[in-house]
């Protein structure tokens, strides 16, 4: 068990490779990444046996920015017989189970990468899931409750119709979503599809049980670069009153809610109204990531907000390095003022050439 598989958006394999190598080295684990451009996944191979399992346990999944899923895998199973793919797959799982007790496993995902080529396998994967699940249950696996907070999910990752990896992820340190992708439905009354970015960010960064406490009708938000209102929509839907800052027009449907005030100003120059306590700042402006980072830092240091979600648009080259630089600079700015804070960042499914960052100031 010396291999990890990590899913990602196609085109971001090098960023995942750099990130997993960094995170592994912090734990004293070393290896190399197998990268195929635009494949939608990376295989990280550790130099020492059993270290992949350690990484899957000890690298906090929520600290990985570019990875959608992280799991320990077998070697590649090749030339599977179309008449009986299940037997060698079960055998591979049995080998993994010598090290990990799959009696605590609760779910099976038969998956592909998120590419057009791989998606051609999606119908096969869906049909194959039922007989494979039955075969694994005969081994005494997949019997744990889906709501448990420990144990594993089992994964069968097909790269071709006759080639797959089998593996597992830890329930307390993975994405619970199939292929690592949350399925969100576009609201018919939302002004733009960008609304899904903020919805996914809220679901990713804020625990469900805390959402009503941290986003509610007693709060005020500011949306910088708000037009036409995709992000404002998500705040208004949760009851917030929003100052929507943009020279462009906002959707009439948002004005009709009575929960927004349109401020036709430059997002970089806008300051919150005096005697108003702003709880949330959101920002999805197309600008250099370093400039956005400074803007967000200014809001937090001035006490203009307590919590923020914003996007950093990525450069064409050295994307991982630029992200780390921006996040480190923000952390230094806040730490120098003795602020207690939490930073999370993720390349969300609904992001493209950008990442989404969440910062919360703590008491």
UniProtKB/Swiss-Prot annotation:
InterPro entries: RlmM_FDX, RlmM_THUMP-like, RNA_MeTrfase_FtsJ_dom, rRNA_MeTrfase_M, SAM-dependent_MTases_sf. Coiled coil: none annotated. Its EC number is 2.1.1.186. GO terms for molecular function: S-adenosylmethionine-dependent methyltransferase activity. The active site is at 313 (proton acceptor). S-adenosyl-L-methionine binds at residues 194, 227-230, 246, 266, 284. It is found in: Cytoplasm. One of its GO terms (biological process) is rRNA processing. Keywords: Cytoplasm, Methyltransferase, rRNA processing, S-adenosyl-L-methionine, Transferase. Pfam families: FtsJ (PF01728), RlmM_FDX (PF18125), RLMM_N (PF21239). Gene3D superfamilies: 3.30.2300.20, 3.30.70.2810, Vaccinia Virus protein VP39 (3.40.50.150). It catalyses: cytidine(2498) in 23S rRNA + S-adenosyl-L-methionine = 2'-O-methylcytidine(2498) in 23S rRNA + S-adenosyl-L-homocysteine + H(+). GO terms for cellular component: cytoplasm. Monomer. This is Ribosomal RNA large subunit methyltransferase M. It comes from Haemophilus influenzae (strain PittEE).
């Amino acid at each position: 068990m010396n291999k990890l598989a990590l899913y990602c958006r196609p085109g971001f394999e090098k960023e995942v490779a750099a990130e997993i190598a960094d995170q592994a080295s912090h734990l004293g684990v070393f290896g190399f990444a197998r990268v195929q451009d635009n494949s939608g996944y990376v295989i990280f191979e550790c130099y020492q046996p059993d270290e992949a399992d350690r990484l899957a346990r000890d690298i906090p999944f929520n600290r990985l920015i570019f990875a959608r899923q992280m799991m320990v895998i077998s070697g590649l199973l090749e030339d599977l017989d179309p008449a009986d793919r299940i037997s060698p797959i079960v055998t591979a799982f049995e080998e993994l189970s010598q090290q990990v007790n799959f009696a605590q496993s609760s779910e099976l995902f038969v998956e592909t990468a998120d590419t057009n080529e791989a998606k051609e396998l999606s119908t096969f994967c869906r049909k194959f899931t039922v007989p494979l699940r039955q075969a694994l249950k005969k081994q005494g696996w997949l019997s744990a409750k889906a709501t448990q907070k420990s144990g594993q999910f089992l994964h069968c990752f097909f790269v071709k119709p006759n080639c797959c990896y089998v593996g597992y992820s830890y329930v307390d340190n993975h994405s619970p979503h199939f292929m690592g992708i949350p399925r969100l439905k576009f609201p018919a009354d939302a002004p733009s599809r960008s609304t899904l970015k903020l919805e996914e960010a809220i679901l990713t960064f804020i625990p469900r049980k805390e959402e009503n406490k941290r986003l509610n009708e007693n709060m005020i938000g500011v949306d910088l670069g708000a037009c036409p209102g995709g992000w404002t929509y998500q705040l208004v839907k949760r009851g917030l009153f929003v100052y929507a800052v943009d020279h462009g027009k906002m959707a009439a449907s948002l004005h009709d809610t009575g929960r927004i005030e349109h401020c036709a100003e430059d997002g970089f120059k806008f300051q919150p109204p005096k005697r108003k306590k702003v709880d949330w700042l959101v920002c999805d402006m197309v600008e250099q990531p370093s400039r956005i980072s400074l803007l967000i830092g200014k809001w937090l240091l001035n006490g203009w907000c307590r919590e923020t979600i914003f996007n950093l648009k990525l450069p064409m080259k050295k994307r991982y390095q630029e992200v780390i630089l921006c996040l480190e600079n923000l952390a230094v700015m806040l730490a120098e003022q003795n602020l207690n804070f939490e930073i999370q960042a993720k390349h969300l499914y609904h992001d493209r050439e950008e990442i989404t960052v969440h910062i919360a100031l703590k008491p």
